[in-house]
From Swiss-Prot:
MF terms in GO: ATP binding; protein serine kinase activity; protein serine/threonine kinase activity
The protein's name: Probable LRR receptor-like serine/threonine-protein kinase At4g29180
Topological domains, Cytoplasmic: 531-913
Native source species: Arabidopsis thaliana (Mouse-ear cress)
Domain of life: Eukaryota
Amino-acid positions noted as binding ATP in the UniProt annotation, renumbered to this chain: I573, G574, K575, G576, G577, F578, G579, I580, V581, K595
Active site positions, chain numbering: D704
Catalytic reactions of this protein: L-seryl-[protein] + ATP = O-phospho-L-seryl-[protein] + ADP + H(+); L-threonyl-[protein] + ATP = O-phospho-L-threonyl-[protein] + ADP + H(+)
Biased composition (Low complexity): 879-896
Ranges annotated as biased composition (Basic and acidic residues): 862-877
PROSITE patterns: PROTEIN_KINASE_ATP, PROTEIN_KINASE_DOM, PROTEIN_KINASE_ST
Signal peptide feature range: 1-22
């Protein structure tokens, strides 16, 4: 039996026999890279639970180390080092880690490498590591049995962390194990805040007796190496030392031992040399008093670097550990740290442990978020068989295969995309349109079907479009032909399948008579049906006004009928600028809501006069009635009918038992509105908006998206209502139309307000405000303690900059939510309210992102009642509410008050730069 088989059997037995004890390892990600599929086990040396790596990466091959270096010849070989994942293809291959604590938190990331001649070449490779888009370190091995360990402390800039291996032409990259550990985000501070990562240089246990300090002794699972020169003594204690006083939490076996010089008057000295004098080093020194000092004894210490003081004099505590670090980076070639006793000290200096890190700047930029979302959608839609992991454009030396980028701005942009011969199937996806800065697109030699979509003409910077070698049919859109004719676009298509207007006309001569004849027959039949239905309508409503015919299931009511079904307008269930809403009941008992339109209905446009209000009401009533007849979606309020008999106007909807979202959030009912329910409401509303933008032909922009226009039924399912201000766009063009500004203060898109240009992103802005109201429980416009008006975006800004998601979330949730889900939700909301509409996501992306938020919430464990109370108590102690819920009905907007401008929040919270 081969060595690998023996090891695998033993490996499986241990994996089955040991109960995986993940408790205490909350937030740990421990990956055995290259392990067999579906293998999960507990490492007997560390007690750490490891898992296979396929869920984290879809590239590379799994291989075992050679028999010479594996089990049983090496019986003490740690399980994670017995196999590797190797990456013979692609310049950059990335593991995708999604830590449970999400963005804004500090993590220790550790990668392990043992070559073990896994490829039989006896050739030690050299390659680089990156975290996200920034360089981490180079991996160099001295021999095949060496276990090279690399560590970095890094703040997560998003919910996803990419750890990438980069081939630099010196051998095939590989990896044995990858680990992530959540840290206390307040420790390991530097003068650069969170704008650097810290790469481990050394971590020494200077009073080492035995052990490594790893988990479970070290809650952060740091690996401590022994360091004890012959000129040092070692002291220890068995007494209690509080390691939790400080967030650094050194393990007992490390802090309870210390080094001291053999001569009491000598210092403790450490030195190292840097090959790069510009490297910035930070040292973290650990101290605790281990001796019972007498009354006439004292230990007072000062720390020096290259002769300059790092700290003032201090006395190590016998009760708890303390950590001292340099506030300014150490730079230069030669470094010398000296721990000395002061003149007043009777006892020699001590040092329990030390960590030294080099600071790695986060200099690289990320790809523009809209481009990332678009290319990820393309990747998912077509299941692109390329090594597309990590950021598409960054680091700039290693973009994705087939992608060309522009690196002239603070965010990189995709300029060219070559997917020729990539096995693409199906129609040309709408996601290509969202690569708005694209100059060259090559989709040739695939199996794309359907028409050439007109939205490709929206790519205004496109200079080259190659669609040859596909199964596309139909006309070339006029807008594309026009650009190609004007020599602004190099267009390549298959002439035999895709036709210009003249050639298609000749080819369709036979079809024209058939189509015309069919249409004539259909028209005659339709006229006959209409005549019959009109006659029946006159009988049913004898004496009533005969207006447009309503579709099946919709009714036109007379005023007397409206009065009857509302019991003479007996019960008011809502009021607003449009008029009053009454509860009604149809003959079959179905409850309905009757919205009576008054003469001051609907929002006035910017610059409108009162003299035009009556005609405006009539126009908006007509717009809403016509739209309600044509739109049908489960997340749009269902339309029953209307009344317009010359005296009164009314719109009649299905009754929504829980009223509108604005009132519900302000009521006592909101106490029971869990985070999961809020996410469902957000998704429902987003889907309704998505239907208006992308499911209707022609598209519709609502123009008055707000919590008051989102209705809730008895199951808290959300439906968008009130289409009086809606705008129908010509054909499928959602670029923009110039129109008077209408909407509600606090929700109006500032870009629309200032330019009069309306498009779908105006609705997206308003929806971003709705999302912020959902998560905060605040109104779109509120009052501060000093009586000033504040928009909800400005309310959340300071919390995001501090990375305080608890400060953002509605306290009525009592802390019972997934922080990962909440951060993602706020990220979506803030992306919706970016200054420029082009930088906001479309509703397709919003729906997708919100579903991810829901998935994260459903995956978590709910908090206990005790935990909820503690969260609320802590939150109210930290931040008393300085903003009160404020009714937007009290707010009368001037032109300036809705002309709001907010910063770009593609990155925010603790990682805002």
């Amino acid at each position: 039996m081969g060595a690998h088989s023996v090891f695998l059997i033993l490996f499986s037995v241990i994996a089955i026999a040991i109960v995986v004890h993940g408790q205490g390892q909350a937030g740990f990600i421990s990956i055995d890279c290259g392990s067999p599929p579906n293998i999960n086990y507990v490492d007997t040396d560390t007690g750490i639970s490891y898992t296979w790596d396929a869920p984290f990466i879809n590239a590379g091959v799994n291989l075992n180390v050679s028999e010479e270096y594996g089990y049983p010849k090496n019986p003490v070989l740690p399980f994670p080092l017995a196999d590797v994942r190797s990456f013979p293809q692609g310049n950059r291959n990335c593991y995708t880690l999604t830590p449970s604590d999400g963005k804004g938190n500090l993590y220790l990331i550790r990668a392990s490498f043992m070559y073990g001649n896994y490829d039989g070449k006896n050739a030690l490779p050299e390659f680089d590591l990156y975290v996200n888009v920034n360089f981490w370190t180079s991996v160099k091995l001295r021999n095949a049995s060496e276990n090279v360990i690399k560590e970095i402390l890094s703040f997560a800039e998003s919910d996803t962390i990419y750890v990438c291996l980069v081939n630099k032409g010196k051998g095939t990259p590989f990896i044995s194990a990858l680990e992530l550990r959540p840290m206390n985000s307040s420790i390991y501070g530097t003068e650069f805040g969170r704008n650097v990562s810290l790469v481990l240089y050394q971590r020494w246990d200077t009073g080492y007796l035995n052990g490594t300090g790893r988990y479970q002794k070290d809650t952060y699972d740091r690996i401590w190496s022994p360091y004890s020169p012959v000129s040092w003594n070692t002291t220890m204690t068995t007494g209690y030392i509080d390691i939790f006083q400080s967030g650094y939490r050194p393990p007992d076996e490390v802090i309870k031992t210390a080094a001291s010089p053999k001569s009491d008057d000598e210092p403790l000295e450490l030195s190292w040399t840097s090959s790069d004098p510009d490297t910035r080093f930070y040292a973290y020194l650990y101290f605790a008093e281990l001796e019972n000092l007498k009354r006439n004894e004292s230990r007072e210490i000062k720390i020096f670097w290259n002769g300059s003081p790092v700290s003032g004099a201090f006395n190590p505590s016998p009760e708890y550990s303390m950590t001292v670090s340099n506030s300014r980076a150490f730079t230069g070639k030669d470094h010398w740290i000296s721990v000395q006793k002061t003149a007043e000290s009777t006892r020699p200096p001590i040092l329990n442990a030390i960590e030294i890190f080099s600071a790695q700047s986060l200099d690289e930029f990320y790809t523009r978020i809209d481009d990332v979302q678009a290319i990820e959608s393309i990747k998912s839609t077509y299941k692109v068989n390329k090594i597309w992991t990590g950021d598409p454009c960054s680091p700039r030396l290693f973009p994705w295969e087939g992608i060309g980028c522009s690196y002239n701005t603070s965010s990189y942009q995709i300029k060219s995309l070559n997917l020729s011969s990539s096995g693409l199937h199906g129609p040309i996806a709408f996601a290509f349109r969202n690569l708005s800065l694209l100059e060259s697109l090559d989709l040739s030699n695939n199996n794309l079907k359907g028409i050439v979509p007109e939205f490709l003409a929206d790519l205004k910077y496109l200079k080259s479009l190659n669609l040859k070698g596909n199964n596309l049919t139909g006309f070339i859109p006029r807008s594309l032909r026009k650009r190609a004719t004007a020599n602004g676009l190099a267009l390549s298509v298959d002439e035999q399948n895709i036709c210009h207007s003249r050639s298609c006309r000749d080819g369709n001569r036979i079809m024209v008579p058939i189509v015309v004849s069919t249409l004539v027959i259909i028209l005659i039949a339709a006229l006959a049906i209409i005549c019959i239905m009109r006659r029946e309508s006159k009988i049913m409503y004898s004496g009533a006004y005969s207006g447009p015919l309503l579709p099946s299931g919709k009714r036109r009511f007379t005023y007397s009928e409206v009065s009857s079904i509302t019991n003479n307008f007996n019960k008011v269930i809502g009021k607003g600028g449009f008029g009053i809403v009454y509860l009604g009941s149809l003959e079959d008992g179905t409850e309905i809501a009757v919205k009576m339109i008054n003469d001051s209905s609907f929002g006035k446009s910017k610059g409108s006069s009162s003299s035009s209000s009556s005609s405006q009401v009539s126009k908006e009533f007509q717009v809403e009635a016509e739209l309600l007849l044509t739109v049908h979606h489960r997340n749009l309020a269902s339309f029953v009918g209307y009344c317009d008999d010359g005296r009164s106007m009314a719109l009649i909807y299905e009754y929504m038992a829980n009223g509108n979202l604005q009132d519900y959030l302000s009521s006592e009912n909101a106490e029971d509105l869990s985070w999961e329910k809020r996410l469902h409401i957000a998704i429902d509303s987003a889907q309704g908006l998505e239907y208006l933008h992308h499911g209707c032909r022609p598209p519709i922009v609502h123009r008055d998206v707000k919590t008051a226009n989102i209705l809730l039924n008895d199951n808290l399912e959300a439906k968008i209502a009130d289409f009086g201000l809606s705008k129908v766009f010509p054909e499928d063009d959602l670029s923009h139309v110039v129109t008077a500004v209408m909407g509600t203060p606090g929700y109006v898109d500032p870009e629309y307000y200032n330019t009069f240009k309306l498009n779908e992103k105006s609705d997206v802005y308003s929806f971003g405000i709705v999302l912020l109201e959902l998560i905060t429980g605040k109104r779109s416009i509120m009052k501060t303690d000093d009586g000033e008006k504040m928009n909800v975006v400005h309310y959340v800004e300071p919390f995001l900059k501090m990375g305080d998601i608890d400060g953002v979330v509605d306290p009525r949730l009592h802390g019972d939510f997934s922080s990962n889900s909440a951060w993602k939700f706020v990220e979506v909301a803030m992306s919706c309210v970016r200054d420029r509409g082009t930088n906001r996501p479309n509703t397709n992306q919003i729906v997708s992102d919100l579903k991810q938020c829901l998935a994260a919430e459903l995956a978590r464990e709910p908090k206990s009642n005790h935990e909820k109370k503690e969260v609320v108590k802590e939150k109210y102690t930290k931040t008393k509410s300085t903003v009160q819920n404020y009714s937007s009905n009290e707010y009368n907007s001037s032109s300036g008050s809705v002309s709001l401008s907010f910063g770009d929040y593609s990155t925010f919270g603790p990682m805002a730069r």
